[in-house]
A protein has these predicted regions:
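A short, N-terminal "cap"/entry segment at the start of jelly-roll beta-barrel domains
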Residues: 4-10, 14-66, 77, 147-163
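Short histidine-centered beta-strand/loop micro-motifs
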Residues: 57, 77-83, 102, 109, ...
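Conserved short histidine dyad/triad with adjacent acidic residue
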Residues: 66-84
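A mature extracytoplasmic/lumenal domain signature
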Residues: 69-70, 82, 94-97, 104, ...
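Histidine-centered metal-chelating micro-motifs
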Residues: 75-77, 99, 106, 116, ...
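A short beta-strand-loop-beta hairpin characteristic of the jelly-roll/cupin
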Residues: 85-112
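Ligand-binding loop in jelly-roll beta-barrel domains
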Residues: 120-147
Length: 163
């Protein structure tokens, strides 16, 4: 838990703390407020997102870690990380403001430093708030026979209820 404070401290050192001031501004302005690169357009998975997302691999050996950035209003479809043993995903918010929601539960707001552990088999989605850029580290939890099942889009009737 104390290690996560390093992300918040690094952000304070390398930015002027104005992440909220670029909430719905340009990608270039937002990129200056986070400590990981935004990366490239997430074309490979675009069909599973509403809006534009970007990915930047942070760790490629061992346990994969990717920085995923969502433009304001962008979210991924409902999906499930599957595994026969272990598996799942951990999200660590590193910039902006976003949401995570499990099927049948209320959405959880995510801000820099917040972390969510998603066990294998849990239907969920995550993405940016309607008025803010959002970045999180996506950490694949080691497991056996890991896969992701992509499901239906998060409809406007669900997304429009976010505050």
């Amino acid at each position: 838990p104390k290690a996560w404070a390093a992300f918040r401290m690094a952000k304070e050192v390398w930015t002027d703390g104005s992440a909220d001031s670029v909430a719905a501004g340009s990608l270039e302005a937002y990129a200056q407020t986070i400590i990981f690169p935004v990366g490239n357009p997430n074309d490979a998975y675009a069909k599973y997102f509403i809006g534009q997302s970007y990915t930047a691999p942070v760790v490629t050996d061992g346990v994969p870690v990717v920085n995923v950035t969502f433009e304001p209003g962008c979210r991924n479809n409902w999906h499930v990380h599957k595994a026969t043993k272990g598996g799942g995903q951990t999200l660590v918010c590193v910039g902006g403001r976003g949401y995570y929601q499990e099927w049948g539960k209320e959405p959880v707001e995510l801000r820099p430093g917040d972390a969510i552990n998603i066990p294998a088999g849990v239907k969920h989605w995550h993405g940016a708030a309607p008025d803010s850029w959002f970045s999180h580290l996506a950490i694949e939890v080691p497991g056996e026979n890991n896969s992701t099942e992509w499901l239906e889009p998060v409809g406007d009737e669900v997304y429009s209820k976010l505050k």
